Amino acid sequence: MYEQRTYRRDIKAGDLVSFQAAVKETDLYIRASRDLSVEAVAAINDVRGPLERYIREHPVFLHSLEPLPVEKDAPDIVQRMAQAARLANVGPMAAVAGAVAQMVGEKLLQSSAEVIVENGGDIYLKVSRKRMIAVYAGDSVFTGKLALEVEPGRTPLGVCTSSGKVGPSLSLGIADAAVVIAPSAALADAAATAVGNMVKTEKDVDAAIEFGRSIKGISGIVIITGGKMGAWGDIKLVKT
C-alpha cells in the first residue's frame, strides 16, 4: 500500500534535482546536482546486499531490541549499525534507515558535490549552502512552524526522527517527534529511537533530553510531544 510522505516536501533545496530510488523496502527521496536515480538504485543494492546476507546468517540481528556484538569481518553497514546501537543502547535495526541513507549518500557524492538523502524521515546531507529542514511532528501545533537551519560547514550530517505517532518504524514512546542530529546518520537514527522510547508523557521530555545528551557523538536534540517542546545542543531552530 502506498503511504503518502508529506514530509518529503520539508527540505528547502529548490536548486537541486529531486528524484526517487526504491529497492524492496528501501524507498529513498534524493536531491543532488543532477538526476542520479540509476546510480542510486545501484548504490542501494550495494548497501542492502551485504546486510541481507548477514541477516540470513544471523537472524537475531533483525529482531533484537538490544545491542548485539558482531564479528570484526562483518560488512561495513552491519558494523555501523552495531556501533550505533551500542552507543544508544537499542537494537541494531534502529539504525538501519540512517545507515542506508548515509552509505548511499556517500556513494552519490562521487557524482554530485551536494547530496540530500531521505529514508523514511531520516536524512543524510552534504551541502555547500545553508539548508532548512522543517520539523515534522504529525498533528502537533509545532508542525509547519519550525525548521532546523543547517550550515554547510556542519555537513556531512545525519538528521533523524523517531515518532510514536507518525510512520511505520517501531517506537515504544508517544513523542510526536524525537529529532537527533549527529555526524553519523546511523547514530542519529538509533539515538532518536532511544530518546523517543523514553517519552511516555509530556513530563518525560526533559529526562529524555538529558538521556540523549549522554550518548557520545550526538550534537543536537529536539523533542515534541503534544504542546511541549524541548531542545538541546548545537542546533538552530527558526520559525517558518
Task: Enumerate the language-model features and the residues they cover.
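Conserved mixed alpha/beta catalytic, RNA-binding, or beta-rich assembly cores of soluble enzyme
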Residues: 79-90, 94-104, 108, 112-202
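Conserved, well-ordered active-site substructure
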Residues: 233-240
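Short beta-strand scaffold segments in enzyme catalytic cores
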Residues: 30, 122-126, 221-224, 230
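N-terminal short beta-loop-beta anion/metal-coordinating cradle
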Residues: 11-14, 46, 50-77
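N-terminal basic/disordered segments at the start of proteins
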Residues: 1-28, 34-36
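Flexible, glycine/charged-enriched surface loops at secondary-structure junctions
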Residues: 55-69, 114, 201-232
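Polybasic, low-complexity association/targeting segments
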Residues: 21-58
